[in-house]
Amino acid sequence: MKQLTILGSTGSIGCSTLDVVHHNPDSFRVIALVAGKNVARMAEQCLEFSPRYAVMDDTSSAEQLKIMLQQHGSRTEVLSGQQAACEMAALDEVGHVMAAIVGAAGLLPTLAAIRAGKTILLANKESLVTCGRLFMDEVKRSNARLLPVDSEHNAIFQSLPQSIQHNLGYADLEQNGVTSILLTGSGGPFRETPMCDLAAMTPDQACRHPNWSMGRKISVDSATMMNKGLEYIEARWLFNASARQMEVLIHPQSVIHSMVRYQDGSVLAQLGEPDMRTPIAHTMAWPNRVTSGAQPLDFCKLSALTFSAPDYQRYPCLKLAMEAFEQGQAATTALNAANEITVAAFLAQQIRFTDIAGLNLAVLERMDLHEPASVDDVLQVDAIAREVARKQVIRLSR
């Protein structure tokens, strides 16, 4: 039985992970749950899965949780703060850590899991977007293992030969017969919206993804295709891919989750319903397979599968992310931080949808980008970029 810590248990990925546990009670045991401030959901999870530990972001949330659990006779030990989260990621009895805390807050707990030599089920994009080389070097040093949870990276992983799967981030694609990686994306809810109408799009419209059920922040990132840009950066690190070895495709149906092109002309793809439980279950059980709870793909009900090249005028955030990778980790860190601030401002209706890309670019242009040598350096770049972004939002929204 595999013992799990789930970082970000009350979020979308965390809840889907627990659903996979629910479907496979003899295969997985939850040792620790870590979350932010959603006390009610954490209480429900603790009562159903009886973890040994539960960690909340702050003491107030932890106290509320403690009272709720005591009323139900739960023996789960309640802790709070980032240090406790890092300790849960490194517990001796835990072999697998689901890293699903969104944003820069997930960096240190994920790093703690890596340094403890765990198998990390990586759903936190920011870990590689901001700390790609630092994290990949630490994985090798600590003999940890990364298994990608993002549906696209998981699809690529499944389509690659074992020689690359067992040496992620370092294997030479060309020497293993791989020509390129094809990263697919739906194009989001505004794929066919006239360009002249994009400025008027509301947060609710941006969050109506045609295929996936996701949180509001990542839904906006899908609409701008910043999500695909961050996935591009992540794929470059995970699969040791050059710009020449990467292709980005718009695939509106979200049935093919990504592909790998081989030197002999073959293209291997992973298909499935757009349900995150599929890649989650794959990483949890790898190299075996378990029931995910997802519906099987019905080929007889599929419409045509279509593909097109991305329009960078419609999706400037995608181009911005691809260019940031070439500038280095300081640029990708600053872009990610700026984007979190600008998306939050859009969701709060402080700026327009079309302001997001321009503000992100403005932050990059105002930053003095020195390559970070440590996670502390990354966090400093992150903090400065957030402050610059906040000032840009205030200036624009006056």
UniProtKB/Swiss-Prot annotation:
Keywords: Isoprene biosynthesis, Manganese, Metal-binding, NADP, Oxidoreductase
MF terms (GO), sorted A to Z: 1-deoxy-D-xylulose-5-phosphate reductoisomerase activity; manganese ion binding; NADPH binding
Record-listed E.C. numbers: 1.1.1.267
Domain of life: Bacteria
Residues that coordinate or bind Mn(2+): 150, 152, 231
UniProt enzyme class: oxidoreductase
Pfam families: DXP_redisom_C, DXP_reductoisom, DXPR_C
Cofactor(s) in the UniProt record: Mg(2+); Mn(2+)
Catalyzed reaction equations: 2-C-methyl-D-erythritol 4-phosphate + NADP(+) = 1-deoxy-D-xylulose 5-phosphate + NADPH + H(+)
Positions with a binding annotation for 1-deoxy-D-xylulose 5-phosphate: 125, 151-152, 186, 209, 222, 227-228, 231
GO annotation, biological process: isopentenyl diphosphate biosynthetic process, methylerythritol 4-phosphate pathway involved in terpenoid biosynthetic process
Protein's pathway: Isoprenoid biosynthesis; isopentenyl diphosphate biosynthesis via DXP pathway; isopentenyl diphosphate from 1-deoxy-D-xylulose 5-phosphate: step 1/6
Record: residues binding NADPH: 10-13, 36-38, 124, 126, 215
UniProt similarity note: Belongs to the DXR family.
Record function comment: Catalyzes the NADPH-dependent rearrangement and reduction of 1-deoxy-D-xylulose-5-phosphate (DXP) to 2-C-methyl-D-erythritol 4-phosphate (MEP).
Subunit text: Homodimer.
Record protein name field: 1-deoxy-D-xylulose 5-phosphate reductoisomerase
Native source organism of the sequence: Salmonella typhi
